[in-house]
Amino acid sequence: LEWKEGFSATRMAELNSDYTKKGSFGGDTYWGGKGLTQMAHYLTFALQMGDTATFRMAKQRLKEVLIDWYTYTPGEERYYFARYPRWGALIGMDPSYDSETFNDHHFHYGYFVYASAILCMLDEDFRDKYGPLAREVARDYANWQRSADEPWFRTLDPYCGHSFAGGLGNQGNGNGQESSSEAIQAWGGIWMLGAALQDQEMLEAGIFGYTLETRATAEYWFDRQRRNIDFTKYKHPYCCNLTMQGVGWWTWFSGDPVWMHSIQWLPISPILTNFFSEDLKLTCWEYT
């Protein structure tokens, strides 16, 4: 598949510069995290294109916002993480989509870990001072150490081979997960952060989770071998929402088919390139 107009270095440079200057960061952990990862992507684009000025500007903006999240100033109402010791969890302020009840932590915090990993690779000062805090955010959803302060692999069910998004698992249809792509990104971020911090145990945990999550996504969400879903009854190309009661073509926030499709592909990321290379035709699938 090729973009019919081809790659334009001039247009890409304009996009890099524009986003670096105007890109915003939401005030909650989901939209704030997405803004962080987008800025991390743009700074790598600028670096690869040799645009030193844009790269430095993007890196500085990303660094400032991540430091704000990883520190607390008495009296501030948002942009910080609070530890809930009774639950062994971190809650980012402001929470969203019920993240205060531990929903979707790997989705939300995976953005922070991914963006932090990129910045740690490019900024030694940030790596040394704030890398350990990024590690704590990663441990919230994927604690690879059997310790008392965090559950072991909070969001991952090793037996099922994939993550669950429900923090308490008390929905009427049991626990489940919509966005396979955000789950994969969360593991990729741990893998990258482990490499950046030279933390072998963390790196291996990221590889472990990434391997399980991608294989489960291929098996249960996309059913590549067509051996799990009865497509004579299920009239959709793949599963959008996998719960303990089966497959579903719905999301928690919309019934529009465009969201059922895109929630398995976004955010566009190098982390997904290898996995989704087998699904390029499906990526461009048009709902009819």
What are these regions (language model features)?
Residues 160-165:
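Interhelical loop regions of multi-pass alpha-helical membrane proteins
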